């Protein structure tokens, strides 16, 4: 895979001796995986389970297969499955998935809620919100409301309401380069900083929707520190937050200057990229 020169230089500086293995990992095939839907099926079992996950398996499921069409399984990349697993809501919670389409994290959050509590799955894009609705309906989650709003408009309605907010933020998408090579066309040295400005705007609205004692889980599918550790540090500096350490499993490594956070690289883990 051919990378922009600025990308290579950046990750040689960040990863040092690991940079060669990191860049070489992009020549491998993207990893496919899926989850069993515990709301519908508890008897299905497959080989090649993703370690340390309750419902995840490596492998590809056809969109035309009976298991997919009936919502018994949901296709989701392995690293992406870690976000809702870190969030892990308990039944009865009021949960917001703020950038939810196409529905991977929302279906997983709904699995943890097990029909008890409320999940608001929001997607600002009208087109993508329709896909989100289809996936949530197929999954069979009954305690979910799908909204098609900006974070700013939601914040006017849900001030101090949610026990848990998950934001898998719009980002530069570096972690998806292997799966979606076209995403590299949008990348530039300045692009992560541009994304970070939007991320701060969304987070400022998210903070107002958290109930007292609530939790905010922030994630991206990129490795750019501008969009990850620097955003977390901005939250800590700007608001009354306490950073909860993440258990580093499945090849996770500590974040840059924030060891409580976690990074996932394809040369450490059988999956794509995630923060």
Predicted regions and their residues:
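S-adenosylmethionine
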Residues: 1-275
């Amino acid at each position: 895979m051919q990378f922009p020169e600025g990308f290579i230089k950046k990750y040689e500086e960040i990863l040092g001796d690991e940079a060669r293995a990191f860049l070489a990992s992009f020549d491998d095939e993207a990893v496919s995986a899926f989850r069993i839907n515990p709301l519908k099926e508890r008897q299905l079992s497959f080989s090649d389970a993703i370690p340390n996950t309750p419902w995840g398996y490596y492998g590809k499921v056809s969109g035309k297969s009976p298991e997919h069409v009936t919502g018994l399984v949901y296709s989701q990349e392995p690293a992406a499955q870690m976000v809702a697993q870190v969030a892990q809501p308990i039944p009865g919670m009021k949960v917001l998935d703020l950038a939810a389409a196409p529905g991977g994290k929302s279906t997983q959050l709904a699995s943890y809620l097990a029909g008890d509590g409320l999940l608001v799955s929001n997607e600002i894009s009208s087109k993508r919100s329709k896909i989100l609705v289809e996936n949530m309906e197929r999954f069979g989650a009954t305690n979910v409301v799908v909204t098609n709003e900006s974070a700013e408009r939601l914040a006017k309605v849900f001030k101090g309401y949610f026990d848990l907010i998950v934001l898998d933020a719009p980002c530069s998408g570096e972690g998806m380069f292997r799966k979606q090579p076209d995403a590299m066309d949008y990348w530039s040295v300045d692009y992560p900083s541009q994304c970070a400005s939007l991320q701060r705007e969304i987070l400022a609205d998210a903070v107002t929707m958290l109930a007292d004692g609530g939790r905010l889980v922030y994630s991206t599918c990129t490795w750019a520190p501008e969009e990850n550790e620097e955003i977390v540090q901005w939250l800590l500096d700007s608001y009354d937050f306490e950073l909860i350490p993440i258990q580093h499993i499945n090849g996770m490594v500590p974040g840059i200057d924030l060891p409580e956070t976690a990074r996932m690289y394809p040369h450490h883990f059988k999956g794509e990229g995630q923060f």
